[in-house]
Regions:
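P-loop NTPase Walker
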Residues: 1-34, 216-219
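A short acidic, amphipathic alpha-helical/loop segment
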Residues: 7, 156-164, 271-274
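Accessory N-terminal region flanking or inserted into the helicase ATPase core
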Residues: 56-146, 155-160, 173, 183
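Conserved interdomain hinge at the start of the Helicase C-terminal
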Residues: 241-256
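Generic beta-sheet signal
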Residues: 143-145, 171, 253-262, 377
Length: 377
């Protein structure tokens, strides 16, 4: 969506239906965020029934309505997957996909009490959004609808999707069964594969990203899968490179830009610590960079030494990295929050005691952080 807005010079109001299924359901059902189950509700439910339920987290969509579900509770995951797959909790439990030794009686209690809790407090969860939308017949009528990443839809989401395209003149369903890696999370790729006999197929046979060596490796793996759509998929012209490393420490990432993928979030945290030790700057969507504020403070300080005035917020951010020897901070309380301040004025009127480079001035930043930031800059 953001790329479309930028590329075609649009606003958010120009694309009211460029959104996830959950976001569409949230909007058309006229819901408010305080009507949706949050972490505090699951915690409260656990205290009411006498044992911890764990917590549920929803990765937020661009409008804050949420989309992907994750939880540290295997009980909640079983309940979630049963809904996504249109089966009972008994059937999901019998699949034995959970990793812990769980009590079915506890599962039944949590499932029943969760339903009662939502009813008593007039709350819904994100699965309820999809189910309520499908039952409501509130889908707008479109001339054309595009459903992207369709291989990742669950049976429950397929029902919602059909309720949309049944009111649509033309429907384009985009996806790739070879990229269906979320079956464990409830995705029903079989529904996507079945569409090839119901719709006109418009295959994209030329990749513009995958070089030949990577393509060869990928095809050697994917061709072992028996139940898949047979397709022609050509690589880019360039050969590319393929290297195997058994540890992230052996990869030289000191030059260029790198994209690092991992199976789980905690693995990214370990990799981030390795990059941090090497003084390599990185961004992780799940974790704020340790030195983001320090980097902003150092940049503002360097600009101030060159004569650029500082805002009150910049002064606040800079001052927290200085000890009492470098800044008598009590005088900061007399500053006007809407004003700007030159470094000489800060020395004269507001307690600043030093005018040297940031890595010498920031005596309370911590040497490890300072060393990291100096390598990065």
């Amino acid at each position: 969506r953001d790329e479309a807005i930028k590329k075609f010079n649009l606003t958010e109001d120009d694309l009211p239906y460029f959104r996830t299924l959950h976001s569409l359901a949230f909007r058309k059902l006229g819901l408010k965020k305080d009507q949706v189950m949050q972490q505090r509700h699951y915690k409260d439910l656990g205290s009411k029934i006498g044992f911890p339920v764990g917590y549920a987290v929803y990765q937020e969509d661009h409008d804050g309505t949420g989309c992907n579900f994750s939880s540290d509770s295997e009980y909640l995951r079983i309940i979630q997957l049963a809904q996504l797959r249109n089966i009972t909790i008994e059937q999901q439990y019998a699949l034995k996909e959970h990793t812990q030794d769980l009590s079915f009686s506890n599962l039944r209690i949590i499932s029943n009490e969760l339903k009662r809790y939502k009813k008593d407090y007039s709350l819904i969860d994100f699965n309820d959004m999809i189910l309520d939308f499908t039952k409501s017949d509130k889908s707008p009528k479109f001339d054309v609808v595009f459903i992207d990443e369709a291989q990742d839809l669950s049976l429950m989401q397929w029902d919602m999707t059909r309720s949309i395209w049944n009111k649509t003149t033309d429907a384009f369903i985009a996806g790739d069964d070879d990229q269906a890696i979320f079956r464990w999370a409830g995705a029903d790729v079989d529904s996507f594969i079945a569409l090839q006999d119901q719709m006109i197929n418009l295959p994209l046979i030329q990749s513009h990203r995958i070089p030949m060596k990577v393509h060869q490796l990928a095809m050697g793996i994917i061709n072992r899968i028996k139940y898949r759509i047979d397709k022609t998929w050509k690589p880019k012209i360039n050969e590319g490179t393929l290297q195997k490393h058994f540890d992230i420490e052996s990869v030289d990432m000191s030059q260029g830009d790198w994209l690092i993928l991992s199976r789980t979030r905690h693995m990214l945290n370990d990799i981030g610590e390795s990059l941090y030790r090497k003084g390599l700057y990185y961004k992780n969507k799940y974790k704020r960079s340790n030195e983001q504020d320090l980097h902003a403070a150092a940049s503002a300080w360097e600009n101030a030494l060159k004569g650029q005035p500082l805002s009150y917020k910049q002064v606040e951010n800079i001052s927290k990295y200085m000890g009492p020897k470098h800044w008598h901070k009590k005088k900061i309380k007399g500053m006007a929050k809407e004003s700007f301040y030159g470094i000489d004025q800060l020395v004269r009127d507001y307690g600043l005691q030093i005018k040297t480079v940031w890595y010498e001035a920031f005596d309370e930043a911590g040497q490890t952080k300072v060393d990291y930031l100096r390598k990065m800059r």
